[in-house]
Amino acid sequence: MKKNKDNQSQTKVNKELLNAFKRYVSVYSPSGNTHKISTLVFGDLASLNPDNIFTDYYGNIHAQFNCGEGVTIHLNSHLDTVPRTQKNRTIKELGGIVYAYQKNKRAILGADDRAGVTAIFELLDQIVVKKTLPFKGTLLVSFFLDEEIGCVGSSKSDFEFVQQADFSITFDRKGNSDIVVGTYGVAFSNQSMCEWLQSFSIQKGYDFTCVEGGISDAYTISNDMGINSINLSVGYYNEHTDNEYLVLDELENTIKFASELLLNLHKPINEGLTKEAPFTNSIVGKPKSYSYQFEPTAYYDNANGVVSITDGQVTIDCLNEFEIDKLIQSLKRAKEMMEDDYYNWK
């Protein structure tokens, strides 16, 4: 969180932000069943009159906003929620914290990653509609599908569109102050950008810190597309569980931090800091054991399974034959993260 926030932001709920979040999180669209949220998001993007808007062959949504001369920044989040997200949830807010209920019991909220979707639209509202954020440059926006089952959407997206970017920001991290710059020994941003980001956070009075985190579409963008990337906290906790919740103040704080980044990223970019490939930094360690919880999409209601990778061995439990195609895709994404001479793949 920012250290010098005003008192009002701590005591008054941002109703506009709450309503925007509820608009997206209320839509039931788990992995493999994202038509409803895709239709809503595409319509909302189109209403902003972007210079370009399209869906790629997998169904990911992309848009471009030309905002004058300057650098090119890519903003992204994913549209799907985990496959076990319940239908007919009721979204409630109490004291600035948002929960989901189904039949009077706590349920998966889906802030992972509808909070990220909300953050991007709030930034676009400031830049394109209200014009209160004087960003100069080009904004590329992507909403990826099926991140929750192995970053499938981003791995099948329009690489050429994203590769126009000088830098990419993913909005898909739990907590309130993480700048994820790598995962499981794989860097998202180079050392120079990590140092600049950490210094910038301190200079502007924020508590955001460069850390190693979990898997997100930032992995695909950095390692498959070669773009220096980060993944920012957006204020959700206990994701993928019935105890999931979102802290609105923390989401709002991330939007403020991201807005300041957008106004200042031209500095490291013009200094050439993003020209170095995003493959090493001092934050991430060596590749380590990795476990992936595989969950089926909605149309395989009776299936579930676990893929675990420990001490160089892959174990697959409780999978039936109908999940093999999706399992293979998930394993391919995991395999790309590992060193072939360290892990024994079977």
List each language-model region with its residue ranges.
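N-terminal capping segment at the start of a domain
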Residues: 2-33, 240-241
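A non-catalytic alpha/beta surface segment that caps or lines the substrate-entry region
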Residues: 23, 27-70
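Active-site metal-coordination/substrate-binding segment of hydrolases
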Residues: 46-49, 64-65, 69-138, 148
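Flexible, glycine/charged-enriched surface loops at secondary-structure junctions
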Residues: 52, 133-138, 205-211, 266-277
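Acidic/histidine-rich catalytic neighborhood of metal-dependent amide-processing enzymes
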Residues: 105-109, 113-191, 210
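Zn-dependent metallopeptidase/amidohydrolase metal-coordination segment
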Residues: 209-254
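His/Asp/Glu-rich mid-to-C-terminal helical/loop segments that flank catalytic regions of hydrolases
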Residues: 238-290
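Positively charged, low-complexity terminal tracts
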Residues: 281-346
